[in-house]
Amino acid sequence: RYWLLADGSRLRLNARSKARPLLDGAQRRLELRRGAMRLEVKEDPRGAFALDCAAGRVDCASGSLLLAEERGAIRLVTLRGSARLTTGEGRQLAVAARRSLLFDAGGLLEQGPMQAGEDAWASGWLEVHDRSLAWVAEAFRPYLPGILQLDAEIAGNRVSGLFPLDDMHTSLDMLGRSLPIRVLRYSDYWISLRPA
């Protein structure tokens, strides 16, 4: 679901995500409190739209970008248009269009070209290309009402695929059929992934 903001920009939040708007006549600003957001920034004479997060700030004059928590850091993906990243330590970095960066308050952790499917959740899908099962399980958790346990023995298994986020039962079954794992459902609120 999208929200149309007062300046004409459009915001989409991922499951269990939270953002706080700080919009007034003088500034355009959002704070990512938890999860992931996609923002389509409309150009405005007041200047760039500021996105605050635990690890720094992103400014974008116009375009589309994704900001998401990932492994204790923040993922920034510039889908369309460029942005400026200011890390928690004050370092500034110009980010070109179609780039993907991972950063924390201490600075840049990784950067590279945008990967296919990084924003697929906005369309209801998780697109995975050679990621660990631990990464996939973490991506599934916001869409499950309870606990998803993952046995450490299988956490490193590599996964590729396209998974429907609005049908976790099917997504988990797909993992069980494609990997040497067992999906144990004790209830809708307690699911465990174990070695086969």
Where are these regions (language model features)?
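Short, small/hydrophobic-biased targeting/export segments
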Residues: 1-105
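N-terminal export/assembly leaders
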Residues: 107-196
